[in-house]
Amino acid sequence: LACVLVESWNLLLALRALLGLALSGLPALAMAYVGEEFDPPSLPAAMGLYIGGTALGGLLGRLLSGLLSDIGGWELALGGIAGLGLLALGLFVWLLPASRHFKAQPLSLRVLLGNFRLHLRNPRLRGLFLQAFLLMGGFVALFNYIGFRLAGAPFGLSSTVIGLLFVVYLAGIFSAGWAGRLVPRFGARNVLRGGVGLMLLGVALCASAWLAAIVLGLGLFTLGFFAAHAVASGQVGIHAEGAKAQASALYLCAYYLGSSVVGYVAGYVWEHAGWLPLMAVLAALFVIAAWRARSL
């Protein structure tokens, strides 16, 4: 809310940076809570519902901020989103059950580093961190540059129409929960590979010059991403040997590192080689992800 009131550009940037720092810890804490409070058989479905909720939030945030910006400018958009955040905080405090399995530990740099080393020595966790890097990197890369592709020839779509493509996030809301329920029946490895397979099919369709095929490809790609992400993030809580919050934090570090590194590389490929080579790079990433899923 303070961002709406300040008049200094530098102060606004500082407040947004603080907001980013605060937000970055929330997914790790949420994943750790789910991992600690649900038993292993029900954990994949619970994590799938959580990931589906993040997809819904991402969609509503984009649509609502755009609507409020058109009505009253960026101040109304920021204020409206902040107001909804306060409402969500109140509901969170009121409805969230107290943790039953959390064990407090003294804050110690030596203990923190020891826990990080423990997680990084775990081959299954390393495999999951790699999945986070590859999957999120590819997801961000496609959605970062598909707009440039569709704005240019032969499509020439407007920014408004391109923005509506984020409606495909609805597919992720359902696929995340669906994937979590499939894990007990088919196993995490197979469900994860199925999600990555959908991403590969989506990339192949996005390489087309036919708009309908690209829209279908984006839908399948989003289905696959949220399914695979739900499975991988749920497995972190299962395979972490204690200190689940730090294991989740490492997963998310890999997740966002992938978005930064692959997003940058994808931009270079797009600028210097074009769309089809970019699709080939993304396909290669997902082939690696499917191959490395054998470690689960």
Language model: regions and residue ranges:
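Cytoplasmic helix-loop-helix junction between adjacent transmembrane helices
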Residues: 15-53
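Juxtamembrane intracellular "pre-TM" segments in multi-pass secondary transporters
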Residues: 97-129
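Helix-breaking motifs and short loop linkers at transmembrane-helix boundaries and internal kinks
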Residues: 4-11, 39, 208-209
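Helix-to-loop junctions at the C-terminal end of transmembrane segments
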Residues: 174-187, 270
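A late C-terminal transmembrane helix in Major Facilitator Superfamily
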Residues: 239-273
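Pair of pore-lining "gating" transmembrane helices in MFS-fold secondary transporters
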Residues: 121-138, 219-220
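C-terminal transmembrane helical hairpin of 12-TM major facilitator-type secondary transporters
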Residues: 189-232
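Helix-loop-helix hairpin linking two adjacent transmembrane segments in secondary transporters
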Residues: 49-96
